[in-house]
């Protein structure tokens, strides 16, 4: 426990929490342009071809973002919206593409959890 005199001399250190998505810079989402769209393989126990995109953000960062859902229309120079949220089995992928906004179309024929994939309500 410091004395009052020690606290007068130098105040207490603030604890700075390290952000998990620095490229967003405290914004909920960021817009960016895809520089490369490709597939990559996950870490050890899992096996798949995960769809990811390299995105140059308006904040100046270049990040790797996961493209969720079955099928996508994203290609190079597509303008996409990025949100936070990592993919546990893809190292270095800390962002998600928001489906159904800007150039990223919603998932076709999606019935459940539609709001997460930018799909409109089907006609009965």
UniProtKB/Swiss-Prot annotation:
InterPro entries assigned to the protein according to its UniProt record, in alphabetical order: NA-bd_OB-fold (IPR012340), Ribosomal_uS12 (IPR006032), Ribosomal_uS12_bac (IPR005679)
Keywords associated with the record: Chloroplast, Plastid, Ribonucleoprotein, Ribosomal protein, RNA-binding, rRNA-binding
Gene Ontology biological process terms in this record: translation
Region of interest (Disordered), residue spans: 1-28, 104-124
Ranges of biased composition (kind: Basic residues): 11-20, 109-124
Compartments it resides in: Plastid, Chloroplast
Annotated PANTHER family: 30S RIBOSOMAL PROTEIN S12 FAMILY MEMBER (PTHR11652)
Stated role: With S4 and S5 plays an important role in translational accuracy. Located at the interface of the 30S and 50S subunits.
Listed name of the protein: Small ribosomal subunit protein uS12c
Organism (species): Pyropia yezoensis (Susabi-nori)
Recorded name of the encoding gene: rps12
């Amino acid at each position: 426990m410091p004395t009052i005199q020690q606290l007068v001399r130098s105040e207490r250190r603030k604890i700075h929490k390290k952000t998990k998505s620095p490229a967003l810079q405290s914004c909920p989402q960021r817009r960016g342009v895809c520089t490369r769209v490709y597939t990559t393989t996950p870490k050890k126990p899992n096996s798949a071809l995960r769809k990811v995109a390299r995105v140059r953000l308006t904040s100046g960062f270049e990040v790797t973002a996961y493209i969720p859902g079955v099928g996508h229309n994203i290609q190079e120079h597509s303008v996409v919206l990025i949100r936070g949220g990592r993919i546990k089995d893809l190292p270095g992928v800390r962002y998600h593409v928001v489906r159904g906004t800007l150039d990223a179309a919603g998932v076709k024929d999606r019935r459940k959890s539609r709001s997460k994939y930018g799909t409109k309500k089907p006609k009965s």
